[in-house]
Amino acid sequence: MALKADVLVTNVALFDGETFKDGTYDVRVENGRFSAVEPAGTLAKRESETVVDATGHTMTPGIIDCHIHSLVNNAGSLEGFTEPFSLQFYRSVENLRVTLEAGVTSARDAGGADAGVREALERGLVRGPRLKVAVTIMSQTAGHGDGMLPSGACTPMLMAHPGRPSGVADGVAGVQVKTRELIRAGADHIKICSTGGVLSAADDPRHSQFTVDEISTIVAEATAQGRRVMSHAQGTAGIKNAVLAGVASIEHGIYLDDETIDLMLERDCVLVPTLQAPLAVIRAAEAGVPIPEPMVEKSRRVAERHRESVAKAHQAGVRIAMGTDAGVGIHGQNLEELELMADVGMNTAEVLRASTVNGADLMGDDSVGRVRVGNHGDFVLFEGSLEEHGVGQLRSVEKRVFQGGVAV
């Protein structure tokens, strides 16, 4: 079972998931959940609880990353072809640990982690975020999630194994069956690709994949089983197809135009920008990671357009939820995404909402993302006033992370 504790945090400035609160607060976590949020000096210490004097600190809900790949390291590199298949599971233990230590207490895995990874976290066998899993990525033949390479070899990144079926499917009947297979495997949500991508050798991020009818079938089947659909969508046409079909979120959104932004607003479709992703590919290649040059070149080509599209969507009022695509980049650097969101014009409260309550709402989990009575006692204490100093240099700010009231 996950660890739980009783703790009283005193005299702390508070961002509760929605807004910065006036004054300072005492916040109690009892048996792993928030049990009281009161003005500072109101709550008396109990014998059973640990007291944390948070004078001069800002409390936020635990950060929520809506797009990670916890079983993936250096996505797109050639290293996986020479490594034992099972190494990914052992690496994930470290990936999940550093993600939690970075302040991410809940996350949505966008492909790779199966139900066993989620259960290991729930049982407390490993430490990491509260995790919801897609199991794998659903893709059309020759799509972004089809691991078959031009050489005839198959990439090992999402290789099928018991508990993680192949995600490749075609046609309305085919995608209906595949959606059911992924739900049978334990998927909390369905991840699809409605465009090509940067880290796939044989396609183009501007080209659409899956038809509207196929995506609509996936959404209908997922919805019938209480699941939501997230769509890797970079090119304009594929973004539009996914939004029209009813997906809950667009991942990346590199080539957004005015019409597509208006459609997202109309359908209340969330954007998960992953601004970190193309920058991470470029940095990895420059550091000597063996990533094929066409993938690096695509990353260079899209990086600035990506930034412009996210800024435009934000200005128009599209709801944004934080996601990093960690696994493409280095695990544990999740807070860089908050800095990048600030850099495209989001103010501090908007960035923090995107990184807490918006993520919780997108995942359909009202037990996280807010500092409120009854929610899991997941929070981060940042040194200083975030309201005053902002989040532009957040990785350099000293912090303490708590999950279920337990210090990480």
Language-model segments: residues:
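Metal-coordinating catalytic core of metallo-dependent amide/deamination hydrolases
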Residues: 125-294
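Non-catalytic positions within long, well-ordered alpha-helices that form the structural scaffold/packing
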Residues: 93, 100-101, 183, 243, ...
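Metal-associated gating/positioning segment near the N- to mid-region
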Residues: 57-123, 141-148, 213, 237, ...
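His/Asp/Glu-enriched, well-ordered alpha-helical/loop segment
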Residues: 224, 289-294, 300-386
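Histidine/acidic-residue-rich catalytic or RNA/ligand-binding cores of hydrolases
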Residues: 74-77, 119, 201, 239-245, ...
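C-terminal cap of metal-dependent C-N hydrolases
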Residues: 12-15, 353-357, 373-408
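Divalent metal-coordination and catalytic microenvironments
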Residues: 12, 27, 32, 56, ...
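N-terminal metal-binding scaffold of metallo-dependent hydrolase/deaminase domains
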Residues: 1-46, 57, 385-393, 406-407
